[in-house]
């Protein structure tokens, strides 16, 4: 492990809202995935979606899914992707048997929250929201995402822990605190 990964794992494990800022391909995914998996195992009675991992594109979420699955499935943690390419049979299965970790994007979250679908009710059990590539959520898109996050906070029965990951974020702490509406700790990678 790199020093920043150890620090991030510790902070996320303690329940802190964390920004993981490190270069591309330096192990940011492991830095948030390992403590989330540990939390799921610790709360083994957990029913419903425990964590939502948001990626800016379907391609990136589909690329990350096998990597996340490799860690999770060995210890019985279910991980599913729900996006525009998820077929009706898979969608029904996700709604009827919610995974521990759900991989999606903000467009899907917005649509289902807005239309109050069965899928949106799955989100009420969420305890951790991970936003990868957080730097893309700036400008008008970022303000829309801020309001999606506010709606998520309203429907969740738990206080949500926020984790952001990015390789390139100018003034990352201020940016993420505005995006999520909470105080955040920053962990820097080399």
Walk through the language-model features, giving the residues of each.
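Canonical AAA+ ATPase core
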Residues: 170-172
């Amino acid at each position: 492990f790199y020093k920043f990964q150890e620090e991030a794992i510790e902070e996320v494990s303690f329940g802190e809202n964390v920004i993981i800022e490190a270069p591309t391909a330096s192990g940011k995914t492991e830095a948030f995935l390992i403590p989330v998996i540990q939390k799921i195992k610790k709360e083994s009675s957990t029913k419903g979606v425990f964590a939502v991992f948001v990626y800016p594109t379907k391609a990136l979420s589909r690329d990350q899914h096998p990597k996340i699955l490799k860690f999770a499935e060995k210890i019985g943690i279910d991980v599913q992707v729900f996006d525009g390419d998820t077929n009706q049979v898979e969608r029904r299965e996700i709604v009827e048997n919610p995974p521990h970790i759900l991989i999606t994007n903000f467009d899907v979250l917005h649509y289902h929250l807005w239309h109050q679908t069965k899928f949106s009710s799955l989100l009420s059990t969420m305890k951790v929201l991970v936003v990868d590539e957080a730097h893309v959520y700036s400008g008008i898109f970022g303000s829309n995402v801020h309001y999606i996050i506010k709606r998520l906070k309203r429907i969740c029965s738990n206080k949500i822990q926020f984790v952001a990951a990015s390789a390139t974020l100018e003034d990352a702490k201020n940016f993420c605190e505005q995006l999520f509406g909470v105080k955040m700790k920053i962990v820097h990678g080399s």
